[in-house]
Amino acid sequence: MILAVDVGNTNIVFGGFDNNGELRFISRLNTQVSRMEDQYAIKLKDILSLYGFENAAITGLNIKIDDPSVLGSDLVCGGVAAKSKYPTPCIFIDVGTCLKIFALDRSGAMLGGAIAPGPRLSFEALSGKTASLPLIGAEPVGKMIGTNSPDSMRAGVIGGIACMIDGMIERYEEELGEKATIVATGGYASLIAPLCRRELIVDPDLVLEGLHIIYKKNQKK
């Protein structure tokens, strides 16, 4: 399938063509500046699913969660790239607005994962829901025992996420029954990885590479 996209100020129009050049479907989505990239990706995945283009057929990824249709496209792409590039079982971690920790089993199937607030959401919650804590940005943590509010917040958020990742890896491997390759991506991955006690492979382009792998796979059909 070839997906043609016409992005306008009011609507985004999607057209799906089969390999014979026949237009299979047209779908429209309201253009909203406030939507994040992931939200558009989810909407697009829903549209493709509506017209019979399922994840397994498009991506080659065996998704074993309760409802594969609700898995975010960023996680699908990350799973595809992790399966292609690294030994399995594999735990891939996306440290962005949300912290997403997902697992592939030895066969490369997506088992599921965990979702928690990432650095940005955590800092916004601390500032927005308390009377005196400032809104700060994510910066490297020098020491875990902070001596002022910003340093203590960074130690709690950045250092705390690193500790969460270490703990979740340990528990995931208990459920998997073996050690796993650990891959981290997302905007904050390079900031978090040095604080983790487990070695993380930082792969900032994992999701984009997954998109490319999916494109090449479908180009062959």
Question: Could you say what each language-model-derived stretch is?
Answer:
Residues 76, 131, 163, 200-221:
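Glycine-rich phosphate-binding/hydrolytic loop that grips phosphoryl groups
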Residues 24-25, 54, 110-115, 200-208:
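Short hydrophobic/aromatic-enriched beta-strand-loop microsegments
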Residues 38-53, 168-175, 214:
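A short, N-terminal amphipathic alpha-helix
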Residues 18, 60-130, 159-168, 200:
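Phosphate-binding/catalytic loop of phosphoryl-transfer enzymes
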Residues 2-42, 107-134, 139:
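Short glycine-rich, Thr/Ser-proximal phosphate-binding strand/loop in the N-terminal lobe
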Residues 2-6, 90-94, 183:
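Short glycine-aspartate micro-motif
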Residues 141-178, 199-200:
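Adenine-nucleotide phosphate-binding core of ATP-dependent small-molecule kinases
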Residues 46-58, 178-187:
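Short glycine-rich phosphate-binding loop at a beta-alpha junction
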